Amino acid sequence: MITRPIILVILCYAILMIVQSFVPKAVALKRKPDVGGFMVEDQRTHKSHNYMMKRARNDVLGDKENVRPNPYYTEPFDPDTSPEELSALIVDYANMIRNDVILLDNSVETRTRKRGNIQVENQAIPDPPCTCKYKKEIEDLGENSVPRFIETRNCNKTQQPTCRPPYICKESLYSITILKRRETKSQESLEIPNELKYRWVAESHPVSVACLCTRDYQLRYNNN
């Protein structure tokens, strides 16, 4: 006759076997995938997208030629095979650029804003507050200079009535290189070809090419 202790031992053993059969399934459900580092959160939907493409274990281990030590061998990402993942990745990357602001002290500040709430200011150059008149003159540099005649545009030295303070008409100077016939061997010259340096010297000459309306900063500092 079976005693009560033996029945109790058999019952405990059966319960232990049942519990062990359900434990692997519960652990498998709770276990997170080992590719969490490749998950990118969509900031608009707060959902995670996995951008790592896995090959099936059977596809890798089934063919002897494709046997590799890593069953999760990844292939190059092809945009045509998964256009939805590619578009989501581009959106997430744009969100990261939009939200991360690099400050002057090299720190990163995260900011959020609504899409489409971007104001673009008009960056057009404003018209000058006045117009300046100029006078064309022909400057003669002498018969030993090449070129000999240069056209200049000189401003009127007096305050023009169309340009009122704090603005003033000012000449815009441009330096040109001219050739002058060498008079002495000790004359200083800019760099010129060897076939010219024995008879000619190169000099920089300023030329007034325009008359522009600009702010008179000298008048401003004198008033302060």
Swiss-Prot record:
Annotated signal sequence range: 1-29
Tissue expression: PTTH is synthesized by two dorsolateral neurosecretory cells of the Bombyx brain.
Glycosylation sites (chain numbering): 156
Gene3D superfamilies, per the entry: Cystine-knot cytokines
A GO molecular-function annotation: hormone activity
Domain of life: Eukaryota
Disulfide bonds: 132-169, 155-211, 163-213
InterPro entries, A to Z: Cystine-knot_cytokine (IPR029034), Insect_Hormone_Regulators (IPR052876)
One GO biological process term: neuropeptide signaling pathway
Keywords: Cleavage on pair of basic residues, Disulfide bond, Glycoprotein, Hormone, Neuropeptide, Signal
UniProt subunit comment: Homodimer; disulfide-linked.
PANTHER family named among the record's database cross-references: PROTHORACICOTROPIC HORMONE, ISOFORM F
Role description: PTTH is a brain secretory polypeptide of insects which stimulates the prothoracic glands to produce and release ecdysone, the steroid essential to insect development.
UniProt name for this protein: Prothoracicotropic hormone
The species this protein was found in: Bombyx mori
The organism's taxonomic lineage, starting at the top: Eukaryota, Metazoa, Ecdysozoa, Arthropoda, Hexapoda
